[in-house]
């Protein structure tokens, strides 16, 4: 998100930004158990999508709702194994590599600049060997 989108955020709203989603395989399994159907709006392998009022043109394959870039391959490993995510965001384009292979992303991202945010939605999460580099 941007500084403006974070400071004006109301409770329950999502900040503006582009999300690179990291979900454990158990999330999809739990969804299937609760709904009786396979998820068609998310994967556990590296979706990239806009949040809040942000916009992005997703790379294919695209989720049925049209704004989410689904990964071209299912390369993430289940817990407790570690995954390597490489995210590159330059000039309004975001690209994601999972365990060494490019799988998803998008272009024409708005906002095109902002903060890097790490978050968890109600479950513990661990990161290791995190490296951040400012790119042009």
What function would you assign to each model-found segment?
Residues 1-136:
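Carbohydrate-interacting regions of secretory-pathway proteins
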């Amino acid at each position: 998100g941007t500084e403006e989108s974070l400071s004006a955020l109301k409770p329950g709203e999502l900040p503006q930004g582009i999300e690179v989603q990291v979900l454990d395989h158990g999330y999809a399994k739990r969804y299937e158990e609760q709904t009786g159907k396979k998820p068609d709006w998310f994967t556990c392998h590296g979706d990239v999508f806009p949040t809040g009022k942000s916009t992005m043109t997703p790379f294919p394959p695209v989720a049925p709702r049209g704004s989410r870039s689904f990964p071209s391959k299912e390369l993430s490993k289940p817990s407790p194994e570690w995954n390597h995510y490489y995210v590159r965001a330059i000039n309004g384009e975001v690209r994601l590599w999972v365990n060494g292979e490019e799988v998803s992303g998008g272009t024409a991202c708005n906002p095109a600049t902002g903060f890097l945010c790490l978050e968890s939605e109600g479950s513990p999460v661990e990161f290791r060997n995190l490296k951040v580099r400012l790119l042009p």
